[in-house]
Design a protein with these regions (language model features):
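Acidic, PIN/NYN-like endoribonuclease modules and their adjacent C-terminal/linker elements
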Residues: 30, 34, 100-133
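Anionic group-transfer/hydrolysis microenvironments
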Residues: 7, 38, 115
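A general structural signal for well-ordered alpha-helical segments in protein cores
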Residues: 34, 38, 56, 60, ...
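Phosphate- and divalent-cation-binding pockets in alpha/beta enzyme and binding domains
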Residues: 12, 36, 82, 119-120
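Short glycine/serine- and small hydrophobic-enriched flexible loop segments
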Residues: 39-46, 104-105
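Active-site neighborhoods of divalent-metal-dependent phosphate/nucleic-acid chemistry enzymes
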Residues: 68-116
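Short, well-structured N-terminal submotif of metal-dependent ribonuclease cores
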Residues: 1-34, 49-58
Length: 133
């Protein structure tokens, strides 16, 4: 089973559109992932101007559909001390460390397109990119 991070979800939706929804069955995301994916789309639209406002809205609706089909893991389900320990020892954000801790605790493969996160995560859990799923 898979745990998708925001970078993977955003890239899957941009590349595959609604076809990305097929990847959701029995898989997971963190409850904060929607906010992160929305922020990534905002960055692509408002700051980098790589997509239009209309494209960002369409992608956001697909992201919401994608997340609505995934099993969401809340912060209350993850060992907070483990997250903080990873964040401090590996110099990752608390957000990024939460993906590793959740994948570790639930024995999931972490799907991420964040190279820095993947490099650290591969010492703890199986990892894949969105191109590999």
């Amino acid at each position: 089973m898979l745990l998708f991070d925001a970078s993977a979800i955003a890239n899957l939706v941009i590349r595959r559109g609604r076809n990305a929804l097929a990847l959701t069955k029995g898989n997971f995301a963190l409850d904060l992932t929607g906010y992160e994916a929305g922020n990534a789309l905002w960055r692509l639209c408002a700051l980098e101007r790589k997509i239009t406002h209309e494209e960002a809205e369409a992608f956001l609706l697909t992201v919401a559909g994608f997340l609505g089909l995934l099993r969401l893991v809340s912060l209350a389900e993850i060992d907070l001390k483990r997250i903080l320990s990873l964040a401090v020892s590996k110099r990752l954000t608390f957000y990024d460390s939460s993906y590793i801790a959740a994948a570790e605790a639930k024995r999931l493969t972490l799907v991420t397109d964040d190279e820095a996160l993947a490099k650290v995560a591969e010492d703890y859990v199986e990892t894949e990119t969105s191109n590999e799923v």
